[in-house]
UniProtKB/Swiss-Prot annotation:
NCBIfam families listed in its UniProt record: membrane protein insertion efficiency factor YidD
Family indicated by similarity: Belongs to the UPF0161 family.
InterPro entries, per the entry: Membr_insert_effic_factor_YidD
Function: Could be involved in insertion of integral membrane proteins into the membrane.
Stated name of the protein: Putative membrane protein insertion efficiency factor
Compartments reported by the entry: Cell inner membrane
Pfam families with a match to the protein in the record: YidD (PF01809)
Originating species: Rickettsia typhi (strain ATCC VR-144 / Wilmington)
Keywords carried by this UniProt record: Cell inner membrane, Cell membrane, Membrane
Main location: membrane
Residues annotated as transmembrane: none
Entry keyword annotation includes rRNA-binding: no
């Protein structure tokens, strides 16, 4: 299941995202964040972190550097401006 999910994100990253333009206000991009979150924390926690990240990726958020937390307890760390 994890491989299928990661392949889906990779497909989006290379084939769909370029058509939509580079709109992500974060570094790493949301798709890179999703891949890292799923690899680091597994499917359930990784998808939860990805969901929270995508909700923040909108024009009213400052954006900046927002790396995947090393543990879920640290997931409320503030985003750093770049």
């Amino acid at each position: 299941m994890t491989k299928i999910l990661l392949l889906t994100i990779t497909f989006y990253k290379y084939f769909i995202s370029p058509l939509l333009g580079n709109n992500c206000i974060f570094s790493p991009t949301c798709s890179e964040y999703a891949q890292e979150a799923i690899i680091t924390h597994g499917i359930i926690k990784g998808l939860w972190l990805t969901f929270r990240r995508i909700i923040k990726c909108q024009p009213f958020c400052i954006g900046g550097y927002d790396n995947v937390p090393t543990s879920i307890k640290n997931s409320k760390q503030p985003t750093k401006k770049i």
